[in-house]
Amino acid sequence: MIISKQCSNCSFDVVATQFVQWLQSYRQQQQQSGNHHVVDIILQKIGCGGDIEFIDINLWWSQCRTIDEGDAPHSVVRGDSPYAYITNVSDNEISDHLLVTTSQYNASMFRKLFRHIEVVPHAYDPLEVSVVDKVKEKKFDVITIGYDTADDHKGLTVARKVALDLSLRYVEVSNQCDNVGVNASTSQTQIQLADNMICIPFMTLTREDVYRLIAQSRFYLALSHTEGFGLPVLESMVAGTVPIYVDGHAFHEYAKGIPIPAYSDKRVDWYNYEYEDVVEVVKSAMSTSQSEYNELSMRVKEESRHYFHPDVVYRKLINIVNKNVKSNLF
């Protein structure tokens, strides 16, 4: 079986690799129990044409659809996207490929493109649990992570302003770190944005380092205007780092923590919020007593570790795939 992904060292690479690692363990368990009909070989590649393709839905539609209709007519698209780019699709263009996306929000945008859509969230990485449960010290008030674009859809500009205005201990992992310097004490490349505010370039850290930073933060500030899922929010919940999140798009479905009022007006794929609301919610969160914080942190952590457990998520995924493709892949 071939697992394809759109890029290396990106979020799609992360979720594809985690699925493959779980699948290899699942295969061994099945073989040990006497089931020798499970797939023997699992390969990963970049690009189109996999049996399961971890990819941005818009990218698949524009670049892989034509290829897959000929070379991989039964491939399963495992993807998400925060944007509804594609419009004016005629009935004869609707794809027969199965789309397994990560939120009802995403599914609602792409029903015009796919005849059959299932919703299965991402799972958390078991490695994260082994890392974050060893972290005891909170060094930062808030952390935010994201690859931002010119329209600031991740809300990093707002996050920085909030941190500056409220004098928060702030760490950001993003593609918006300019004039990068080197922190001699850790040898990690980072930039000092302001007093107690640092930025670390996106994808320069190991997964363990990212998980450790999340666990060292009290809150995760999730100000995205649009998300098809939002993996760092899941990672923060698993660590017990409480999300302060925009109450819209995919976050409205699965994020647990402290919501920020949001609204969608002219665009179905974009949620706005007021800066004053963000400041008020963040200030309130910062004033939470230690006992209240500990209770909320524990509840968020326990619920997320149950609902997004790899066995729960991936078994659902493979059951859907086996049910809807022409032959069992697993």
UniProtKB/Swiss-Prot annotation:
Pfam families, A to Z: Glycos_transf_1 (PF00534)
Key words of the record: Glycosyltransferase, Transferase
Enzyme class, spelled out: transferase
E.C. number: 2.4.-.-
Record's keyword annotation contains Glycosyltransferase: yes
GO terms, molecular function: glycosyltransferase activity
Entry similarity comment: Belongs to the glycosyltransferase group 1 family. Glycosyltransferase 4 subfamily.
Designated name of the protein: Putative glycosyltransferase ORF330
Lineage, opening ranks: Viruses, Adnaviria, Zilligvirae, Taleaviricota, Tokiviricetes
